[in-house]
Amino acid sequence: MEFYNFKKKLEEKETYKDNMIDNLKKLETYLNSELSVKIQNSLIENNELLIEVDQKDLVQVIQFLKSDDKCKFRQLIDIAGVDYPSDENRFELVYLFLSHENNSRIKLSTKFKINQIINSITKIFPSANWMEREVFDMYGIKF
């Protein structure tokens, strides 16, 4: 009977995590080069890449993330709304995407003022319909 080698498994896990971080850094560099005028900020946190875009560029960036051969973020996981009552740009939407092909996740966020209408992404991700309605119900954000 072979004993479970915990040290070896731990080393494999660390190697996997290092590879994942390296891939996220490459993706971050790629996105910043391809979408340089559209990305306001990007950072890697909790093994996920977060990019911030202006709400006017939201649909174009999401279409790129889904259709680009190096990205392949073809699954929308969720849309979350955030309310910052004291900020000028009071609301933030955070879109969570998954690429099965690349085994990676990305968060895309956009901030905007109260009463701004945000472009819907239901033509790109039909499943966004339900999520956008939930955001409207909770925050009054219109799409």
What residues fall within each predicted segment?
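Terminal low-complexity/charged segments
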Residues: 1-143
